[in-house]
């Protein structure tokens, strides 16, 4: 089980919800256990209508929670697990919080796709709370600066993960490991297919 009671990300989450008190937020994390613990940790800090959405709920409960989130007077925060959010679209919401990140960039694209749908009239704001020097921060930096995952769909994102996975994991475990060379190489590899495509026109 997880204990987020002293996690600085919960304090950050409380603040962003208070600062944007008219907006709705979709939060996605990897597991059903995390959804429950995030909800519990928030309850002690802020009074906000919150719905959860995960694979342990039956279809009727999921539909009900999704409808409550879609309602103008309903939940302002929907806390979703990875599997629970599959196949659902929430294009009426523009704030996406990635509480954690999967190592596979295609899964990140799927998360963004929950909001980035036909009918989305706003720019999507992606929030990624990280703890300094954590694995999560390194993964976020690699995705942002190396793969540009949060800005565009990456053709061949999976092959880039295969190519750099071991070095990425090594950077998680080795505190001295500098991420900059890996980011630089990844960016070069990501841009090569684009250059070939341009030349092939």
What is the predicted function of each stretch?
Residues 1-8:
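Interdomain linker/hinge connecting the two RecA-like lobes of the SF2 helicase core
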Residues 29-53:
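Conserved helicase motor "Helicase C" RecA-like lobe of SF1/SF2 P-loop NTPases
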Residues 32-34, 57-59, 83-86, 102-105, ...:
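Conserved nucleotide-binding/hydrolysis micro-motifs of P-loop NTPases
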Residues 35-39, 79-93, 112-120:
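SF2 helicase motor core recognition
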Residues 48-82:
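Conserved helicase ATPase core of P-loop NTP-dependent helicases/translocases
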Residues 88-101, 125-128:
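A short beta-strand element within the Helicase C-terminal
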Residues 104-126:
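Conserved SF2 helicase motif VI
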Residues 122-201:
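C-terminal accessory region of SF2 helicases/translocases
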């Amino acid at each position: 089980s997880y204990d987020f009671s002293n996690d600085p990300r919960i304090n950050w989450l409380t603040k962003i919800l208070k600062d944007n008190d008219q907006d709705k937020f979709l939060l996605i994390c990897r597991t059903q256990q995390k959804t429950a613990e995030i909800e519990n940790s928030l309850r002690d800090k802020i009074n906000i209508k919150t719905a959860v959405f995960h694979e342990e709920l039956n279809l009727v409960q999921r539909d009900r929670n999704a409808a409550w989130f879609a309602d103008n007077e309903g939940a302002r925060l929907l806390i979703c697990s990875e599997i629970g959010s599959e196949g659902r679209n929430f294009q009426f919401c523009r704030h996406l919080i990635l509480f954690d990140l999967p190592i596979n960039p295609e899964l990140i694209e799927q998360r963004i796709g929950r909001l980035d749908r036909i009918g989305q009239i706003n720019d999507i704001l992606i929030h990624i709370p990280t703890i300094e020097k954590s694995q999560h921060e390194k993964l976020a930096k690699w995705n942002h600066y190396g793969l540009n995952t949060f800005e565009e769909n990456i053709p061949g994102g999976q092959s880039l993960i295969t190519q750099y996975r071991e070095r990425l994991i090594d950077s998680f475990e080795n505190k001295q490991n500098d991420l900059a060379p890996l980011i630089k190489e990844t960016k070069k590899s990501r841009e090569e297919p684009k250059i070939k495509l341009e030349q092939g026109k």
